[in-house]
A protein has these predicted regions:
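Short, solvent-exposed loop/edge segments of extracellular or virion-exposed proteins
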Residues: 14-21
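Accessory beta-strand-rich segments of carbohydrate-active enzymes
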Residues: 1-7, 21-22, 27, 32-161
Length: 161
């Protein structure tokens, strides 16, 4: 991960599941995925990414990084990675896992969860988040048992009155 200024040309949209706003739903996880084709090898490729509240990003199944720095009530942060070592000529996949714990705190960013990313080769954007990304709420995190967090009571519990 590196710190720098955003690319000159910004593309993409903040995306999330259309049926989920993230408000009031605790422990919502989202998998986002986009396939793309690379015609030739590249010496350097930037992946810019941000998410509220957090993300793990993978390229072709390899974990590239996680972040961003914790958002404040007025700002969220972005990161960039050189993903050229992870790219292959032909078919490639970028995958993002994010989770909205929806923990109510005084410092929590007051906006719904969302993801944004953009891939540049050279100075040219070649891939960005938009409505064509495949997004799902995975069932693999629904273990049928109560989950808890150090700062909260049980979030899903048969013991709740």
């Amino acid at each position: 991960m590196a710190i720098g200024t955003l690319p000159k040309e910004l593309k993409g949209e903040w995306i999330w599941l259309p049926e989920k706003s993230g408000r009031g739903a605790r422990d919502v996880r989202v998998f986002a995925r986009k396939e793309f084709v690379l015609e030739s090898s590249v010496p350097f490729s930037e992946l810019w990414i941000s998410a509220i509240p957090s993300y793990h990003v993978y390229v072709n199944g390899e974990h590239v990084g996680y972040g961003p720095a914790a958002p404040t009530r007025t700002k969220c942060y972005g990161d960039f990675y050189d993903i050229a070592p992870y790219l292959e000529v032909g078919s490639n996949v970028i995958s993002i896992i994010t989770c909205d714990m929806a923990i109510p705190t005084y410092s929590r960013y007051p906006h719904p969860p969302k993801i944004w990313c953009q891939v540049n080769i050279g100075d040219r954007p070649v891939l960005w988040t938009d409505s064509t990304w495949r997004m799902i709420e995975p069932q693999c995190y629904s273990g049928g048992q109560p989950r808890c967090h150090a700062g909260l009571e049980y979030t899903e519990s048969p013991y709740r009155k």
